[in-house]
Curated annotation (Swiss-Prot):
This is Chemoheterotroph-specific protein. Found specifically in cells cultured chemoheterotrophically.
Amino acid sequence: MLTYTGTVINVQTFAAKPDP
């Protein structure tokens, strides 16, 4: 469960700050 939450946060961060 904790790993899943970490993955979701990581994905949200990448989506909010995509690489150029």
